[in-house]
From Swiss-Prot:
Homotetramer. Homodimer. Keywords: Cholesterol biosynthesis, Cholesterol metabolism, Endoplasmic reticulum, Glycoprotein, Lipid biosynthesis, Lipid metabolism, Membrane, NADP, Oxidoreductase, Peroxisome, Steroid biosynthesis, Steroid metabolism, Sterol biosynthesis, Sterol metabolism, Transmembrane, Transmembrane helix. This is 3-hydroxy-3-methylglutaryl-coenzyme A reductase. Belongs to the HMG-CoA reductase family. Pfam families: HMG-CoA_red, Sterol-sensing. It is an enzyme of class 1 (oxidoreductase). The keyword Oxidoreductase applies. Pathway: Metabolic intermediate biosynthesis; (R)-mevalonate biosynthesis; (R)-mevalonate from acetyl-CoA: step 3/3. The gene is hmgcr. It is found in: Endoplasmic reticulum membrane; Peroxisome membrane. It is a multi-pass membrane protein. Glycans are attached at residue 282. PROSITE patterns: HMG_COA_REDUCTASE_1 (PS00066), HMG_COA_REDUCTASE_2 (PS00318), HMG_COA_REDUCTASE_3 (PS01192), HMG_COA_REDUCTASE_4 (PS50065), SSD (PS50156).
């Protein structure tokens, strides 16, 4: 209930920052000027002689006071240094200054409004500074700065207020009650200082609850600049702040003790102020005459001012003692160091840690002013460029942006780096291009001229030809004779048709070999999608270590899999075997009658029919060899499932081609047979199917490992008994209750998809490839060790063809030593990759099941997998176990 009230308060303050700030300032000014209506113009030392107790100030007191002031200034300095660690010094610094200033002004106004004596301000100021605690303000600012957008700032401030508000309220109450005890001491100086302390605590609390969140909300609302799709002031993600506050959450026992202590202090104050004082007054035996005389002596007496008021204040400001000079000097020195020197160090550190390499700035160059040269010359430039020169150019591209092209000279450069230095021969082959687009007829003649072509046209002219249908949009790469230039023009054409013209600015397209994409991977290309690639390992499989690449945007996945790999490594490694190898294609054919379909099925099931079809099947490819035919009849439809090895290729295209040849041979035997589709979903490809789970498709693999009890306890933070129990009730009973097909596992699809994307596989085939059953059993002499196995009957995978031809994907395959076709045995690399996938799935299963058994799943994903909040440097469960 209390948190809900504070949340509502935080939402209101963050939603109305101007109103709250103006209201706070107005209230402060009103309280400051309220005593002006009393007509009291008394100013001690100027027009009034105010009697006070003259006491000799000891040198030891001066030294102690000076040390106290210096400590207070250093304390404030270190408070702001802690704010700097958040990475946003200016926003938090300004907000912190606002907090300190408003707290000080409010304290002064309250005390002045209550007509209290201000002579103790000099002594109380250090204690006032020492009572300022910016940790709560810093924590609230973290909530605001963890927002992904402007709209989330208010909600996150409200959440932060709901978490921090009750704790801060209790702490402020306890501080006031504890410090307030000093106001009952009877020692005048101590009473004044404690009064200031209470006012300071209340002022800080008031500013924290009203002024500070409003300022933070307003500052972030006015900061519209963004970087890489997120606000430039964003520090981390919201889950990191939640995790940090969860770890720093006060002990409930301590909170109860504070509440009990507060209640006790309230009773002490009530007894001292309302019960003890009357009795003590009654016990005094001072006569009325003595009291009157004492009061007359202490009353201020009016005198004639000896100087103007402004001169009086100026003299008070100029007159400084030695201890005040020392204090002021230290404050100025630390201020200069903080503002000037540490600013440079911070900016340098952040620029080294987070270099902003924005392809957007490079791409802002007008495409019309881009110039081109012959593709042969482009290749010459890149071939002749040394590795050192390339490294130097890339470094320069990070430090400074590319200059805008101002000349229409044909000088087409591929990549985000600075333009490479051209050889004299290349420069001599350049040609001038017109700045204004030429007529359409002239552009058509240049395009059709065999000696010229599209490279003699500007981008604007090419776009006009595409709009006039003289150049098909899908042929831009081939017509331009430079795939990257075709992609750039397509991006410009598409940008004009999008709701937001700058939508493609953050989608990169440079530094990519599109010649490998054309006709193989993608059409109508507008760029490429960078995906983070992590590594899990080492994975000890069949006595060989592997570093497994995983491309994913799901936090905690790689770290969790890495923990499983470590557990397998400490257990002696995993063993794996390929049970079967055969890609399938299941066409559907139609016969005149169901009896005819049954007759064809019987012929295919016979040895004679199988031999005829196999001869036709095998004659088409040097890799494809028909291993099995599986047939079924539905009415007059006949479904034939061809199963064949396909070497190191995944094999869908290969087996589709040979299936057509086999069907043509079948039609020769049965002329009435009509082929409806070469794929009749009897394969089955990219769809859940029991036939893949039972009969297998692609590579059928099994792997196993034994995890010692010590590793289960120390690395997986669980027990064998708990893991076996969760596996039975989750993976077996739970999947059966859900009617799952091949889903008797925890998250095999996670690992399969991540490896598939990294290694250039067909990501959609994770549907069938993720079929897996995970078995866990207690083993060992005392049945405390864990036996785990994963059986995956339909891993559709290959190391040649498709996305495996792209350089980044080839790099990931090379990490595993399975890139390309095997030079020893056809299909060896693909089978090895399938075993790696199965073993990595087992590692992921092991770690996730342990997290579930130990109850760590939610906490780890709060840290690593919260999209609205995309945490850093926090002790999350998965990284803690993987370390």
């Amino acid at each position: 209930m209390l948190s809900r009230l504070f949340r509502m308060h935080g939402q209101f303050v963050a939603s109305h920052p101007w109103e709250v700030i103006v209201g706070t300032v107005t209230l402060t000014i009103c309280m400051m000027s309220m005593n002006m209506f009393t007509g009291n113009d008394k100013i001690c030392g100027w027009n009034y002689a105010c009697p006070k107790f003259e006491e000799d100030v000891l040198s030891s007191d001066i030294i102690i006071l000076t040390i106290t002031r210096c400590i207070a200034i250093l304390y404030i300095y270190f408070q702001f240094q802690n704010l700097r660690q958040l990475g946003s010094k200016y926003i938090l610094g300004i907000a912190g200054l606002f907090t300190i200033f408003s707290s000080f002004v409010f304290s002064t106004v309250v005390i002045h409004f209550l007509d209290k004596e201000l002579t103790g301000l000099n002594e109380a100021l250090p204690f006032f500074l020492l009572l300022i605690d910016l940790s709560k303000a810093s924590a609230l600012a973290k909530f605001a700065l963890s927002s992904n957008s402007q709209d989330e700032v208010r909600d996150n401030i409200a959440r932060g207020m709901a978490i921090l508000g009750p704790t801060f309220t209790l702490e402020a109450l306890v501080e006031c009650l504890v410090i307030g005890v000093g106001t009952m001491s009877g020692v005048r100086q101590l009473e004044i200082m404690c009064c200031f302390g209470c006012m300071s605590v209340l002022a800080n609390y008031f500013a924290f609850m009203t002024f500070f969140p409003a300022c933070v909300s307003l500052v972030l609302e006015l900061s519209r600049e963004s970087r890489e799709g997120r606000p430039i002031w964003q520090l981390s993600q919201f889950a990191s702040v939640l995790e940090e506050e969860e770890d720093n959450k006060p002990n409930p026992v301590t909170q109860r003790v504070k509440m009990i202590m507060s209640l006790g202090l309230v009773l002490v104050h009530a007894h001292s102020r309302w019960i003890s004082e009357p009795s003590s007054q009654n016990s005094t035996s001072i006569s009325d005459h003595e009291v009157t005389t004492m009061l007359d002596d202490m009353m201020p007496k009016r005198v004639e001012p000896s100087m103007p008021l402004w001169q009086f204040y100026l003299s008070r400001m100029v007159t400084m003692d030695v201890e005040q000079i020392i204090t002021l000097g230290l404050a100025l020195l630390l201020a200069v160091k903080y503002i000037f020197f540490e600013q440079t160090e911070t900016e340098s550190t952040f620029s080294m840690k987070n270099p902003i390499i924005s392809p957007v700035a490079v791409q802002k160059k007008q495409i019309e002013s881009c110039c081109r040269r012959e593709p042969e010359q482009e290749k010459t430039v890149h071939v002749s460029t040394t590795e050192e020169a390339s490294s130097k150019e890339e470094t320069e591209a990070v430090i400074k942006p590319l200059p805008l092209e101002t000349s229409p000279k044909a000088k087409f450069i591929v990549g985000d780096s600075s333009p490479l230095e051209l050889s004299p021969e290349d420069k001599n082959t350049m040609f001038d291009l017109p700045e204004e687009p030429r007529p359409l007829d002239e552009c058509v003649r240049i395009l059709k001229n065999p000696d010229k072509g599209a490279q003699y046209l500007t981008d604007a002219e090419v776009i006009s030809l595409v709009n006039a249908k003289h150049i098909p949009a899908y042929k831009l790469e081939t017509m331009m004779e430079s795939p990257r230039e075709g992609v750039a023009i397509r991006r410009q054409m598409l940008s004009d048709k999008l709701p937001q013209r700058s939508a493609l600015q953050s989608l990169p397209y440079k530094n990519y070999n599109y010649s490998l994409v054309m006709g193989a991977c993608c059409e109508n290309v507008i760029g490429y999608m960078p995906i983070p690639v992590g590594v899990a390992g080492p994975l000890l499989l069949n006595n060989k270590e592997y570093q497994v690449p995983m491309a994913t945007t799901e936090g905690c996945l790689v770290a969790s899999t890495n923990r499983g790999c470590r557990a397998i490594m400490l257990g002696g490694g995993a063993k794996s075997r390929v049970l079967a190898d055969g890609m399938t294609r299941g066409p559907v054919v139609r016969l005149p009658t169901a009896c005819d379909a049954a007759e064809v099925k019987a012929w295919l099931d016979s040895a004679e029919g199988f031999k005829v079809i196999k001869d036709a099947f095998d004659s088409t490819s040097r890799f494809a060899r028909l291993g099995r035919l599986q047939n079924c009849v539905a009415g007059r439809n006949l479904y034939i499932r061809f199963q064949s090895k396909t070497g190191d290729a995944m094999g869908m295209n290969m087996i589709s081609k040979v299936t057509e040849q086999a069907l043509a041979r079948l039609q020769e035997e049965f002329p009435d047979l009509h082929v409806l589709a070469v794929s009749g979903n009897y394969c089955t490809d990219k769809k859940p199917a029991a036939i893949n789970w039972i009969e297998g498709r692609g590579k059928s693999v099994v792997c196993e490992a034994i995890i010692p009890a010590k590793v289960v306890r120390e690395v997986l933070k669980s027990s064998t008994e708990a893991l076996v129990e969760v596996n039975i009730n989750k993976n077996f009973i739970g999947s059966a209750m859900a009617g799952s097909i091949g889903g008797y596992n925890a998250h095999a699809a996670n690992i399969v998809t991540a490896i598939y994307i990294a290694c250039g596989q067909d990501a959609a085939q994770n549907v069938g490839s993720s079929n897996c059953i995970t078995i866990m059993e207690a083993t060992g002499p005392t049945y405390e060790d864990l036996y785990i196995s994963c059986t995956m009957p339909s891993i559709e995978i290959g190391t040649v063809g498709g996305g495996t031809n792209l350089a980044p994907q080839q790099a990931c395959l090379q990490m595993l030593g399975v890139q390309g076709a095997s030079t020893e045995t056809p299909g060896k690399n693909a089978c090895q990759l399938a075993q790696i996938v199965c073993s990595t799935v087992m590692a992921g299963e092991l770690s996730l099941m342990a997290a579930l058994a130990a109850g760590h799943l939610v906490k780890s994903h709060m840290v690593h997998n919260r999209s609205k909040i995309n945490l850093q440097d926090l002790p999350g469960t998965c990284t803690k176990k993987a370390a």
